[in-house]
From Swiss-Prot:
It comes from Xanthomonas axonopodis pv. citri (strain 306). Its EC number is 1.8.4.8. This is Phosphoadenosine 5'-phosphosulfate reductase. The keyword Cytoplasm applies. SUPFAM superfamilies: Adenine nucleotide alpha hydrolases-like. The gene is cysH. It is an enzyme of class 1 (oxidoreductase). The keyword Cytoplasm applies. Its main location: cytoplasm.
Length: 241
């Protein structure tokens, strides 16, 4: 197992992301978290959708920094099971949950624009920007987040296949400590720590977002086909921020 130096890393070394990622690839997920918390910019936070396998990163981060802010974007259209799952994990793991919501209510948005998620790619993109991207950008700015942890994994979709452990977005560093994990790795971690999948997992939901644009997985489908009618996988948070 490759070990990174314990001494502080200079900003110039931090800018050499290719070399840094090569070293991070040789570490376990918990070591990546520990390293990023020690060497990354101040004000770390974790974003979570409280989706199918979210308990992994919530546990991984809260074990090392119990008070780390956990950002949940409440679009107003999450499954009831997601809200209950968030409540249960927040209580069990004693999470420092920070809930951010869109500036416009569901009713007002629909009065202005109709059901945007039914209006093709243009409508879906507008919906995602209003209800997901803007609140997340606001959360990261208000919390002055310098090190942003995510639960992105390469095996989740073709668009995420090249996800690095660390990337730079503006002045912010984005860390995906389980980027190289498979579904089996996730299952083993959940089993080892007696952590649950999202309640809808057992009903065939493998990627869980808003109730109107999430469908059960069926044989022959890719995971990304279960979101946004198969038109796209990403909501924009991990593309535009």
């Amino acid at each position: 197992m490759t070990a990174l130096p314990a001494a502080s890393i200079t900003s110039s070394a931090f800018d050499d992301l290719d070399a840094l990622n090569a070293q991070l690839e040789g570490l376990r997920a918990d070591q990546r978290v520990a390293w990023a918390l020690q060497h990354g910019p101040q004000n770390a936070a974790l974003s979570s959708s409280f989706g199918a396998q979210s308990a992994v990163t919530l546990h991984l981060l809260s074990q090392q920094r119990p008070d780390i802010p956990v950002i949940l974007i409440d679009t107003g259209y999450l499954f009831p099971e997601t809200y209950r799952f968030a409540d249960a994990l927040t209580e069990r793991l004693k999470l420092n949950l920070k809930v951010y919501r869109p500036l416009v209510s569901r009713a007002w948005m629909e009065a202005r624009h109709g059901r945007l998620w039914e209006q093709g790619m243009v409508g879906i993109d507008q919906y995602n920007n209003l209800r997901k991207v803007e609140p997340m950008r606001r959360a990261l700015n208000e919390l002055d987040v310098g090190t942003w942890f995510t639960g992105l994994r390469r095996s989740q979709s073709g668009g995420r296949a090249q996800t690095p452990i660390m990337q730079k977005r503006g002045e912010r560093y984005k860390i995906s400590p389980i980027a190289d994990w498979t579904d089996r790795d996730v299952w083993q971690y959940l089993q080892a720590h007696d952590l649950p999948y999202h309640p809808l997992w057992e009903q065939g939901y493998v990627s869980i977002g808003d109730f109107h644009t999430t469908r059960r997985w069926e044989p022959g489908m890719r995971e990304e086909d279960t979101r946004f009618y198969g038109l796209k996988r990403e909501c924009g948070i991990h593309e535009d921020i």
